[in-house]
Structure formats: C-alpha cells, structure tokens
C-alpha cells in the first residue's frame, strides 16, 4: 500500500489539507481537511510507509501510549483508504 500521488498536501494558516489533482487541475470540492495529528501522521507516512514507524513517531511527538497511537494511525489510514488517498 502507498499514498496516492494524485493528492497535494498543503499547510495554510495552521490549516492542513489534501487536495486531489485531476488531470491538469485540482478539485477543491473534494479537499480533505486534516487536524494537526492527521497532518503529522500523513507526513510521517510520506517519510516511511510503515505503520510501526509512524506509531513510534506519534508516541514520541504527542506522549501518548503505544496502543492509543496505533489505533489513531490505523483509523487514519482507514479513512485515507476510503477517500482513495492510500491505496
């Protein structure tokens, strides 16, 4: 599985979003807004497409337990899959 390269990640005024690219244009009606943790997970997945790597980074960055971090990462990945962002 991997992140779909047809999405552009943008940060603007402390807002995080994934914007789908369709051909030569972007589709603003299908923008996926992220919170700070979602943004962190997405960027970590771009670094290394490995759940354990992302979970360990999340536990260190946000001082959460391994179990909480793993659930958050898996839930986030499942949402990305539903939206076609992670295939």
PLM region spans:
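Long, charge-rich, low-complexity alpha-helical segments
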Residues: 31-87
């Amino acid at each position: 599985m991997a992140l779909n390269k047809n999405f552009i990640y943008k940060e603007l005024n402390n807002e995080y979003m994934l914007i789908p690219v369709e051909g030569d244009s972007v589709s603003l009606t299908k923008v996926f807004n992220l919170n700070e943790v979602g943004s962190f997970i997405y960027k970590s997945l771009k670094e290394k497409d490995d759940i354990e790597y992302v979970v360990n980074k999340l536990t260190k960055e946000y001082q959460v337990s391994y179990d909480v971090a793993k659930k958050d990462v898996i839930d986030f990945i499942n949402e990305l899959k539903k939206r076609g962002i992670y295939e």
